[in-house]
């Protein structure tokens, strides 16, 4: 097979687009800010297809299983993995911020901070309790779940639909085949949308640099540097160790999903790569039913980057405002975040809302301190989103292996660059994942 020129690779195109966006934002900030609709438009196009893709993938995955016990086992294994790894991420963030103490010596008086810009985040955070979160998983209407694009609500309905379709047996086969064909159509739509990914990445990055300026990267830089290094070490050491224990290399895995990582880097939302991740993980050898359950669920229950951010940001605010935090306060913070972090969706800004909710719930920490990190939160969201994406990908492979639903040969071939999915020039193939 003849390789297409490197400049036609989505990986190269997005990388160049991000570089141009940064340059435009630095030299012509006013023009760069006007590019925001390109980034917003691309993310909206992706979100438009997420709900039906999740529905089709989950329904065909569950309905096509031999036994419902397999679904229960997969869900249980996934939740166990999510809880263990996200707890480790929270603890790592807590340990690092206590060792480095990036907020020490700032001596900020919370009463002097401008809280007008954080009012919306604080209000949104106060509204979300644990009971509210659990009740919100059940959609008011099926149409409402799809219209609002709520991942957990769509997932909840999809699991019920898939279970009901499975119970129908051969009588439900025409419905199963129809949904499978719709799935191919939806992945072709994503293939078309991804053609404009470089434009979306350019617009989002240009706006970020133009609106906040490169100078804002220097302000509060110690916290940002500390956070980025922690995320990097978490991916290489923690996720790398998990990957090695399950027979694959984290570096090869990162190379395999490099295009998705660049899309996330440009948009700062791990959700923007969700459809392609579902397709990529299936091509990696993970069973369709496992991918359909683990990837969407992970966007609320397995946000490793967000977990690191939440503990580091909360303790940073305490350090900067000279708010004492003894071991009891920190354990309380950890326990609150074990619950609150599960309510963060993989969309831009959700981590900041959960942080506001956490500060309100703990009570000991000044909510006004959010104003300290509001300016750099947009830059930190990129590290969060990248870590979240890698974490969910690793989780899918691990859970697939635990459930004996992983094709080891395909996994090794794809990660070695010998398969079609790992080729730099490959997008989602025209015609879907396979001919219908």
From Swiss-Prot:
Topological type in the membrane: Multi-pass membrane protein
Record-annotated membrane-spanning stretches: 14-34, 45-65, 77-97, 142-162, 198-218, 223-243, 290-310, 331-351, 353-373
Keyword terms: Cell inner membrane, Cell membrane, Membrane, Symport, Transmembrane, Transmembrane helix, Transport
Region of interest called Disordered, as start-end residue ranges on this chain: 414-436
Keyword Nucleotidyltransferase among UniProt keywords: no
Locations listed in the record: Cell inner membrane
Keyword Magnesium: no
Gene Ontology biological-process entries: L-aspartate transmembrane transport
One example GO MF annotation: malate:proton symporter activity
Gene Ontology cellular component terms for the protein in this record: plasma membrane
Its biological purpose: Responsible for the transport of dicarboxylates such as succinate, fumarate, and malate from the periplasm across the membrane.
NCBIfam families, alphabetized: PRK01663.1, PRK13027.1
HAMAP family, per the entry: C4_dicarb_transport
UniProt record similarity statement: Belongs to the dicarboxylate/amino acid:cation symporter (DAACS) (TC 2.A.23) family.
Protein name listed in UniProt: C4-dicarboxylate transport protein 2
Organism: Pseudomonas paraeruginosa (strain DSM 24068 / PA7) (Pseudomonas aeruginosa (strain PA7))
